[in-house]
Amino acid sequence: IEFTGSTWFTSLVGGTDRPAPERVDIPNTVQADLREYQRRGVDWLFFMSRNNLGAVLADDMGLGKTLQLLTLLAVEAEQGVRTGPTLVVAPTSVVGNWAREAGRFTPGMQVVVHHGPGRLHGFELMRACEEADLVVTSYGIINRDHKDLAHVRWDHVVLDEAQAIKNVGTQSSKSVRALPARHRIALTGTPIENKLSELRSLLDLSLIHI
């Protein structure tokens, strides 16, 4: 496929004479054999992250979006380009799954699960987040603790099952938009459920500053 566009676009994709994004090296801290489409997904996520372009990863359910995201974080840690912790906001039902998958695929990653009645607050929460590689919480907790979490300068804010907050008027949507982050990623297996405007909502979540 040949692309034509502005000078900025040509510079962004590296020119039309070579493919973009380029292949990244997967570090041995990732305990998984990625399929080719997952490798391409990691390459693309890394490309978008390094260019500060928000991303929507919309692979079907069960195709390994969690693994691709964890691998991206491992790649950035290996290359020394991580600028802070990553926050994953997910439905309550999969918060525990994120911690389990991180322990399985990236066992060296420091993970904090911010959920439940015994969760941290205030300075203790900030310190725990800043010492972590990955913090996982739910949309419900974001509504309650968004002021505390907004004091952390996140490298990535990742929205799992992002279609759950496609309505910009909901408190969850407002809370995640208010979180400071260098880069944002929306993960969803159903980017369009009823109408095309839903895709626009997901793009707005990941490209807040554009």
Q: Which stretches of residues belong to each language-model region?
A:
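ASCE P-loop NTPase motor core, strongest for the SF2 helicase catalytic module
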Residues: 2-208
